[in-house]
Amino acid sequence: MKKRVFSALLALVLTLSAVVLPASAAGSFSDVSDKKTAQNVEVLRLLGVVEGNGIGQFNPYAQLTRAEFCKMLVTLMGSSDVLRYKTVTIFRDVRASHWAARYVNYAVRGEKLLAGLPDGTFQPDRAISYGEAVTILMRLLRTDADAASGGIWPEGYIDLAKASGVSAGVELAGGAAISRAQAAQLFVNVLGAKATSSSTDKDGETSTTTRVYNPANCVSRERVTLIALNGNTARVSGGKKNSYDLVRPSSATVLNGLKGDLLLDADGKVLTFVPVVS
């Protein structure tokens, strides 16, 4: 009898906790109240793509600049090659001393995902447009993006983004500025999208490879149901193990109970968890 009463009380406590818990408390940032945004932001925070402003806020509705977008992009890519670009000056308004120089330089010269302006500037503090953002992301995912777009900018790239699922949950005019929350949605979509690369052999034969996009530092994925993030550990069900070490600690609850992919590094540690879109 006592055990039944205790179980009932425990269930009641858990239910009440779930009801009264504010949405912002479920994630890592106090100013993110939308559940979907909180999930996206936590996926990216685990990966190191977003950090907040140092006082526990993400500023989800603030416009994203071109420099900030490059930092998010390159961090998501997970390549250590970015370090080689931190002392380089390509644009006169992004000197080597600029906080985003390595990210801008790598995205422009290392990966050729975007370019500067005809006057030799990059305009790092200008708000990035939706058209610019999806163009960059489609170039990341497809080596033939420029050809596949039909040379129509930005409509051709926007159509590619829709077809690939990269723009799911975000619908804007090409010239519209994007918010930090909208950018988070785009980047999480990329982590679940297919990447296509084409190559030509010595005989002139072209082959195409398609796979789910992974950051460079991700060596494998594992489909699991996330039970909880407890500090430095992720507890899961349905995986090869019941728990995994996290690269970055988290106690956020917003991803709990979701099915998705653990992205694992070479040491078997969790870079992030990407929910599966049903």
PLM region spans:
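PEST-like intrinsically disordered low-complexity regions enriched in serine, proline, threonine
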Residues: 44, 106-107
